[in-house]
């Protein structure tokens, strides 16, 4: 390959598999899974729709709307798992504990998991919530990449500074700035997923 940029076609087919909360209800298959997590209102649904070029994730003005793990098969190649948003203050203590149990069960036990995309609003700082998900990845040994959404809210120089700031705070090298509005940055994320997590 010689380090050449690989331009990958977007998924041709997208099939909703199922929604689940309990491990016993997770779908049975042998494909690689890529999970996508993010703070409520981080722009996760808009990012997923831009990445797949399909409206598979419901965009809501109400944070914390997604309460289930939603499984989608992309181009018969891998399975994307849309995880419930975290950090929504209006949720009760019981709901937060339920969220934590569901996320921990999936991240720590799912054999098909190949990597986690952590979606953040580019204007927010790295917090203890993000650090917790990083700890899950380190304990289990799966890779973690960060997607900074709403990059159109900044100039390019500000976006690069924000990316550098998150890289430093997180200790991660795979940090991407994207804009669903301008349809920028998603291809780089897709290339990264295929090259590092999906390709045999």
UniProtKB/Swiss-Prot annotation:
Residues 30-199 form the EngB-type G domain. Its cofactor is Mg(2+). One of its GO terms (biological process) is division septum assembly. Keywords: Cell cycle, Cell division, GTP-binding, Magnesium, Metal-binding, Nucleotide-binding, Septation. GO terms for cellular component: cytosol. Necessary for normal cell division and for the maintenance of normal septation. This is Probable GTP-binding protein EngB.
């Amino acid at each position: 390959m010689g380090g050449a940029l690989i331009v990958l076609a977007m998924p041709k087919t997208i099939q909703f598999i199922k929604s689940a909360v309990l491990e016993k209800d997770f779908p049975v298959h042998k494909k690689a899974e890529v999970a996508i997590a993010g703070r409520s209102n981080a722009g996760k649904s808009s990012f997923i729709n831009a990445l797949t070029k399909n409206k598979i994730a419901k965009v809501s003005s109400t944070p914390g709307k997604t309460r289930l793990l939603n499984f989608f098969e992309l181009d018969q190649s891998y399975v994307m798992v849309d995880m419930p948003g975290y950090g929504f203050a209006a949720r009760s203590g019981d709901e937060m504990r339920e969220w934590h149990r569901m996320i921990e069960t999936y991240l720590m036990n799912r054999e098909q998991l190949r990597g986690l995309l952590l979606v953040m609003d580019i204007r927010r700082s790295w917090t203890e919530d993000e650090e917790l998900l990083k700890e899950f990845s380190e304990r289990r040994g799966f890779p973690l990449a960060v997607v900074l959404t709403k990059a159109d809210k900044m100039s390019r120089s500000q976006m690069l500074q924000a990316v550098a700031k998150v890289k430093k705070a997180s200790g991660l090298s795979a940090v991407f700035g994207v804009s669903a509005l301008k349809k920028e940055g998603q291809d780089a994320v897709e290339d990264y997923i295929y090259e590092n997590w999906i390709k045999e």
